[in-house]
């Protein structure tokens, strides 16, 4: 079964997104998600050829990136379930894991899945993929070979070496621990993902709502000074009103007081 290579899609693209796209051209056996690319396996190669013709350079995703769709070269002819690591990736202590259920799967589930093969020093989940760091590269290699195409919570996962070790990032961040040095990356990367989709409405909506309660006062009365001037007369009027409210009753009381003095 010859796989179809798919590249240049957005980083947050999920396996189900590609399955829905390619299923229009024939029955898809499976989709293997990698780091920034994927392999799509059709049951019929004629359907795969049709998908390549129709989807190569096709605008896809929120950013309308042009997909790169062609017959896979390095993976062509590889039997299903082969756990061999991609030849173009340098072995590292950190593994890239994808295809697990992003809603149900937690960090402790992934750690429990990989810890039989060596000491796991760090696990980080980023949306629909994860990084698993081992104490040694040998343990990472052993885990990769043992867990490729294995299941985490009934989902078959794809495992490969990460492009760079966490230790290399630590060096750039002053030698801090993996969890600390990588946490800023975690905060930076999801932010564009989170803000990119809702931005047409969300980016504009909060500021008018936030400023609406105050801005009319400043707009109508020409700035803060005028706003304060507007408040001062109100305060004065309230004071005079208070005096006027008391004076009628007070006067009536005084008007009645002379009556007893006028009795014989």
Curated annotation (Swiss-Prot):
Entry GO MF terms: mRNA binding
Keyword Ligase recorded: no
Positions where Phosphoserine occurs in the chain: 181, 183, 199, 215, 232, 239, 247, 255
SMART domains: RRM
InterPro entries: Nucleotide-bd_a/b_plait_sf, RBD_domain_sf, RRM_dom, SRSF
Statement: the UniProt record of this protein carries the keyword Membrane: no
Span of domain RRM: 2-74, 93-164
Localisation: Nucleus speckle; Nucleus, Nucleoplasm
GO biological process per UniProt: mRNA splicing, via spliceosome; RNA splicing
KO phenotype (gene knockout): No visible phenotype under normal growth conditions.
Pfam families referenced in this protein's UniProt entry, alphabetically: RRM_1
Residue numbers spanned by region Disordered: 166-264
Biased composition range(s): Basic and acidic residues: 211-254
Keywords per UniProt: mRNA processing, mRNA splicing, Nucleus, Phosphoprotein, Repeat, RNA-binding, Spliceosome
Record-level GO cellular component terms: nuclear speck; spliceosomal complex
Tissue: Highly expressed in roots and flowers. A presumably longer alternatively spliced form is found in leaves, stems and flowers.
Family according to the record: Belongs to the splicing factor SR family. RS subfamily.
Subunit and partners: Component of the spliceosome. Interacts with CYP59.
Summary of the function given for this chain in its UniProt record: Required for constitutive and alternative pre-mRNA splicing.
Further remark: The splicing pattern of the pre-mRNA is regulated in a tissue-specific manner and by development, and changes in response to various types of abiotic stresses or light regimes. This alternative splicing event is regulated by RS2Z33 and is not autoregulated.
Protein known as: Serine/arginine-rich splicing factor RS31
Encoding gene per record: RS31
